[in-house]
Amino acid sequence: LRSLLKKRGYIRRCTFQNIDFSVMHAEGLGLDAGTIYKDCIFMGCVMTKEMKSKINKTDLIFSKMDVPYNSFRNTLYTPEMLYEGYQIGTPDSYKESFDYKVYQHYLDKGKVATDIKETLARTLHDHSISNALHDLLSHYDEKKVVGVMGGHGLSRSDETYKKIALISKDLTERGYLMVSGGGPGAMEATHLGAWMAGRPATDLNEA
């Protein structure tokens, strides 16, 4: 990005996602009077006055939307982001977390929302997360990525749950990246196993 913003003349056919251009300008980047953006897309960016003067009529600008999540994220979420505000041992504190607030918003708007702004925000968010996931996976050998989907109804007491966790633990220790749809059951077991990689199997049993 920084090397791109040092260019003079037209910057063409680029998409900028969740970029704070005030930070770039504070570093002296993107301020050249001869720089013009053409056929570019700006998604959820912070646009300065100087930046707006460089916009061409061929550009598209998507402003941030009034929803409790960022529709234009350019990275995946971390556990710390999702559970900020939650305190272990205090179950009610989960209601202070980003994860809870967004889920409540989802329920309030409806699983199948009728508000076009909400459906657009969700679709753009899914698109952004897909991009971030592809960026992450591009750093891995595709033959070293193992995905587990389904098995929502598998209970933690089921022997198959334990088997999946052990398989995931073993594969993670052998350098594989374990991915899932993020749901309960088999998918939860997948991440439990990956989390327990490098620890004795007895620790997994206790968990």
Mark where each language-model region is.
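Glycine-rich beta-alpha loop segments
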Residues: R2-E206
